[in-house]
Amino acid sequence: MVVDVIPQAPVDFSESKVKQLLAKYRRAQAIKDQWIPIFEDCYEYALPQRESFYSESIAKRRSERIFDETAVVGVQEFASRLQSGIVPNYARWAEFTSGTEIPKDEQKEVNEMLDTVTEYVFEILQNSNFSQEVHETFLDCAVGTGCLLVEEGDAVHPIKFKAIPLPHLLLDAGHDEKIDHIFRERRIKFRQILNAYPNAKLPVRMMEEMGKNPDKECKLIEIVYRNYNNTKEEEYQFCVISETYEAELFSQTFKGMGSNPYLIYRWSKCAGEVYGRGPLQLALPAIKTSNLVIELILENAQMAISGMYQVEDDGVINVDNIQLIPGTIIPKAVGSSGLTPVQPAGNFQVSDLVLRDMRQNIKKALYNDMLGTPNEKTPMSATEVAERMADLSRQIGAAFGRLQAELVNPVLQRVVYILKKQGRIQIPTVNGREIKIRSSSPLAQAQQQQDVATLDRFIGMLQARLGPQLTNILVKQNETAKFLAKKLGVPEELIRSDKEMGQAAGQIGEMVQGLQQTGMQPRDSINALQNITK
């Protein structure tokens, strides 16, 4: 017997909703508790300045256990290298282009319009705090998971970015293993609640506590979760609840692509896991080993400087009264040897070999040791810079695809969503068909250099076998120029359209005929341009 299952609508009772959300929050907390020991080790050895996952006082010194700073410096360089390769400052690291549903004869006009939109979007990004905040998220990405909050701003700053530390974040995944529940723990003073959430409705007990202690901090939980009942478009529910008072203070619905303000991205992940795994987790054994080796070296150095001594227990020398300082007179019994230095056992010469290997492994895991160390005396050439970026692109190819899908595209979709909401731009929906996002960052261009190299080899082989004239006839020069411009990120307005190419070719033909009538031979450059009309 076949039974039709009728989907049930979610219960609207506020109290029941709060209990359900708190149950999901505690389940997400249980998932995170399994990861906290790994996260805390990464923070302790490589990010000691970051907030701990355990309750600690503000500005507590956490660097006492760090003896080797290779990982501390390396993770900062990793974040800077990642930022310069994917979202470099004051550069267009992506662009909007026409999708597959736009007719080819209209794509150039649409791309020129989208190029103007791209310029405005990146002007907004460059005048915002995006660069500062995304660097903070890249530090968390080294551990495995980063979070960037993108909110609507004011008239001066239309968009505000905020890096959410991993200790404040709890995640849960849905049926497709995509993150569909985001919990942010936030401590805020009572008097600041209505400033942060102007339309919040506070329960009576919270209002009474606010009147008594307005500067007292309370814990709130911001929740964003996916509403799967809406199958036509993306829909998210945003709400703020208090675990202490078991009440919902504020709720809001977000609809459309780019409406989710929380952007979660991961370096890599294993199947079935919610949180990502970053390069710091891979390098953690080497980090601990090098830290221990340096600690032992320092202990051995202290032992070599201060020395160890043995003394005969003759009842004359009282070791508690001896101070090893210049000018000290130490009595000794007749016939005894007094204080005798003890030679330490062990050979610390092997420590240099172990330490060198461990440091090299750490730098390699954090992608800081590529093609050797640049020569400080000689500045890097453009070819060397391009080759180093290509080497980085080859090493992080898999992670780059995930960062493109979970960070770059969502950031631009979110920015476009906010700017459209504010009426600053007019653009169709960015859904991959009408309009698509194409990355033009240094890492993306380094990956596309393979296509350019393939074209160069193809044309070189044709010229070697058939000669340059027949090659010009076989290869479409104008299409080749468009292909190279697309791969190298050249703006669309710099390339002539087919109509403009025809007009230019006609003018060149008239010039050639005029030169032939005067008996002069046309120049090689004119011959090359004339081949465009063939």
Residue ranges, per PLM feature:
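C-terminal anchoring/interaction modules
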Residues: 1-47, 51-56, 308-534
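Short, mixed-charge, low-aromatic patches
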Residues: 68-80, 89-95, 104-107, 242-251, ...
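Generic hydrophobic, helix-prone segments enriched in Leu/Val/Ile
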Residues: 78-83, 130-141, 220, 262, ...
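Charged, low-complexity surface segments at secondary-structure and domain boundaries
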Residues: 7, 94-111, 119-126, 265-285, ...
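Long, contiguous amphipathic alpha-helices that act as assembly "spine/axial" helices in icosahedral shell
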Residues: 106-153, 275-310, 343-376, 385-419
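Structured, contiguous alpha/beta core segments that scaffold functional sites
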Residues: 14, 151-324
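Short, hydrophobic/amphipathic alpha-helical patches that form generic packing surfaces
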Residues: 73-84, 284-293, 299, 460, ...
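Extended, helix-rich architectural segments
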Residues: 1-209
